[in-house]
Design a protein with these regions (language model features):
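Active-site histidine-anchored catalytic micro-motif
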Residues: 1-170
Length: 170
């Protein structure tokens, strides 16, 4: 735990005292190994006021192991655990998204070996004073019509109450 905290502290150090905004609705962050992408992820999160009190943090990333004709919202875990502690999952909101959009299901295999969301969690835990429940979503398709339907289901939540963290390979 101490090693991770020290590493995160080093990544965030250049941004201490910089202007932050509570108006940030979304960040796009890389999910490579921390040695390659940690400073970039910290730069993105550091633009957000650490005192922000989001209702939810939507974590969205690509599937690296499982193809799906849509997305998987993980309603099988009550929380994710990192060396910094537990991050709660809003399983009820995950289930609501599945009810609202036929292209959002729960495919446990999509989350089992996936790293793109988990690598963001320590940054969230370290930076924010209050960690909001997460809504973990793995995207398994690049079909534009399907992505548009998923986006339509997520659109009501894209507001000042929530933060969207898009985990990317680039």
């Amino acid at each position: 735990k101490d090693s991770l905290v020290n590493q995160l502290s080093d990544y965030f150090a250049p941004y201490n005292g910089q202007n932050q905004s509570e108006q940030v609705a979304a960040v796009i962050v890389p999910h490579a190994g921390y040695v390659y992408s940690g400073s970039v992820a910290a730069a993105a999160f550091a633009r957000i006021n650490p005192e922000s009190r989001f209702e939810h943090i939507f974590l969205i990333g690509p599937s690296h192991h499982v193809y799906m004709d849509g997305a998987s919202a993980n309603d099988r875990f009550l929380y994710y655990r990192t060396p910094l502690g537990k991050v709660p999952v809003d399983v009820n909101l995950c289930r609501k998204l599945m009810t609202d959009c036929s292209y959002i299901t729960c495919n446990p295999a999509a989350h089992t070996e996936e790293h793109c969301l988990e690598v963001q969690l320590p940054f969230i835990q370290y930076w924010f004073k209050n960690t909001a429940p997460i809504v973990p979503i793995i995207i398994g398709t690049q079909s534009l019509p399907v992505i548009e339907k998923i986006a339509k289901a997520l659109a009501p939540y894209f507001n000042e109450k929530n933060l969207f963290v898009i985990s990317s390979d680039f």
